[in-house]
Amino acid sequence: MGKIRIYSKQPKPIVSLSETYTVSSSYKSGRATLRLTPDGEYLFTVYGDIGESTAKRSSTHKTTEQKLTNNMLKMYEEAQDAFTAIHKKSKLRLASSYSVQQNVKPQGAYQWKTLDIKKPSDNEAKNLVVNEARNLNHNPKGSSVSESDFIKANLEKVKKERMDAWDEIQKLFNLIEKAQADRANASFKKVYDASVRAQQEIIDGASHIVDDAFHSFPNTLIVPFIIELDYKYNQAAKCIDVSIELTEDPSLKVPMKKATLKTTGKMSVRAKTQGDLQQDYANTCLSLMYYVACNVFNITPNIQTCRISLYTARKANGICWMEFNRNRFSTLCFSSLDPLLDMMGWPNVANLKVLKTTSKLDSMEKTTFENQIKSQITSLT
């Protein structure tokens, strides 16, 4: 199977923010516009009779400044998290949520119709016989009859004829309805059985289920740089090995500046240090591994072990390898997870250097990297 390429989906850009508001003093009034640039520059423009110093002293100005500052800090945080906290978008499905009972609902049953012809009543039959007797008595060519005798002689016969005719219609109607019900219910059952089989294939982790999921990843995974995935799945062993190639170097795309809040309440923007960028690279690589692992586990509950290996472009060098098991992975809280700390609890291969104020994740020569992975797997079996 060929590699599966996941194209980048860029986070929202950091843009200037501005707001215009009205300022009033005892005798003057005007409008002011405060603009905050991505570089942390506060630009102030006043319109009307009001002075700049007066406008800046207003409570509206202070509120607006705080609002723009908080919104700009949030944009910086979101841009940073798009790289270093990719895993926070993850949510692992519980194995129990894949059950047939929860995912496949009965298709229903055919609703029988009712015959739209009323059952003959005794009064209707009697009225027919009475009318017939009266018609005979009004016929000048016929002999007159006793109405009561005629009713007595013919009522039961007419009642039976009408009921027999209605019964025949009812039987034919029921036969038609049964045929329609049998066809409809057979179709419902066919759809239900197919849905059950499809869900059971997900539960069992059929190979085509895994293949289909990986081919859908370009539409479902959200990453800010191009990656390529390859995998080897063993259904019987309930294990999958996934390799990730960083087709694009994330260190070249991660935000190069960071914003902080000063004691004055304003924000400051500065270029990241080399240590900051090294930390970002390590966080981004590990966050990506957790993110991919979660999405792989969500394919099927049959996957109990997920091994993720991360490489540079074209697999020139290895970066990191980890082996995750579903049971412990299901206990992680991704919203507060620190991958750099958590990775120590998993079997791993990485050239991670923890320095005083930062962590550095260096790549390894490919052969050395893969030999260490084999050694780790052997020691675990």
Label each residue range with its predicted role.
Residues M1-T381:
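Long, charge-dense low-complexity segments
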